[in-house]
Amino acid sequence: MFKKNDRSQSRTRRHMRVRKKIFGTAERPRLSVYRSEKHIYAQLIDDVEGKTLVAASSSEKGFDGVGSNKEGAKLVGKMVAEKALEKGLKKVVFDRGGFIYHGRIKELAEGAREAGLDF
């Protein structure tokens, strides 16, 4: 009998494969994205130090949108880009977190690019 793979296990395996190749530094941090049913989260991570440099999410107090749609994801992308530019970070490495690059993940990336991040 074949065992059916569940989506979360497949996503985790995809993410581990990608993480072998993607590495963030202080000069070029990793833009890590996580998508839940209700919210979307983005953070810039320095993997050398193991620290989060900048973070933004749709669950923050100042967020004026819905985190479970594309418009909200685009706002989160712009928020994380603005915070990064304030700290002098312009170049990043995009880590989609094992999620397929479409929908909310794509909108977050486009919002970050529009606000000035380079990846």
Swiss-Prot record:
SUPFAM superfamilies: Translational machinery components
One Gene Ontology term of the molecular function aspect: 5S rRNA binding
InterPro entries: Ribosomal_uL18_bac-type (IPR004389), Ribosomal_uL18_bac/euk (IPR005484)
Keywords (A to Z) from UniProt: Ribonucleoprotein, Ribosomal protein, RNA-binding, rRNA-binding
Xref: Gene3D superfamilies: 3.30.420.100
BP GO terms, sorted: translation
GO cellular component: cytosolic large ribosomal subunit
Described function: This is one of the proteins that bind and probably mediate the attachment of the 5S RNA into the large ribosomal subunit, where it forms part of the central protuberance.
Quaternary organization: Part of the 50S ribosomal subunit; part of the 5S rRNA/L5/L18/L25 subcomplex. Contacts the 5S and 23S rRNAs.
Family: Belongs to the universal ribosomal protein uL18 family.
Name of this protein: Large ribosomal subunit protein uL18
Organism per entry: Clostridium botulinum (strain Hall / ATCC 3502 / NCTC 13319 / Type A)
